[in-house]
Amino acid sequence: MPVILGLETSCDETSASVLSGSGDAVTLDSLVILSQDVHRVFGGVVPELASRAHLTSIVPVAERAMADASISLGEIDCVAVTSGPGLVGALLVGVSFGKAIAHGTGSALVGVHHMEGHLFATSLEHPDAVPPFTALLVSGGHTLLIDVEQWGSYRMLGATRDDAAGEAFDKVAKLLGLPYPGGRPIE
């Protein structure tokens, strides 16, 4: 069964997952490092600081995810890495690291669209969620209403024009004197 190392650095969280299998994939390990403490003083994500946090976190996150999954670098068949949308500097860290691992190990490299990743993640927890369906994607700077006709075939029904829902939560929380990020305190 193929072993996949997944990397995500689109905004302020650095994460790595190790999956095995085809069809019904099994997550062997998943690890996320948050950089919210870095951004809290500013009341929101500062792109340059997010990129720097990824630089210091990406290697330990990937190493620990592989170690916890009892997988060595040589066992990785494919590296799947978020290729966008997201913060340019943050994406560069993840894509560069993913390319280096793929090149060094001879593994395949697959770019993953951040929002499509959210759609697919739904099927991990809800295997009965099969297209066609309509999805509301709310992730950081994105709020989209998507018609999922089949996997890989989507039609955008609507999106916000300015602030996404996540940004609105953070701004309202700041006005109310609540901590960053604002989603949980407001909920």
Summary of predicted features, one role per range:
Residues T82, V93, L109-E116, L136-V138, ...:
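Active-site nucleophile and cofactor-binding loops and adjacent substrate-binding regions
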Residues P2, T9-S10, S17-A25, D29-L31, ...:
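A short helix-loop
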Residues P2-P85, L92, H114, H118:
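N-terminal beta-alpha supersecondary unit
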Residues V81-T105, L124:
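Short Gly/Thr/Asp-enriched flexible loops that form oxyanion-binding sites at enzyme active sites
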Residues G98-L119, G158, D162:
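Short, acidic/small-residue loops that bind anionic groups at enzyme active sites
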Residues S70-L73, G104-G111, V130-P131, Y180:
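Phosphate-handling active-site elements
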Residues M1, G111-T134:
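Conserved phosphate-binding catalytic cores of ATP/NTP-utilizing and phosphoryl-transfer enzymes
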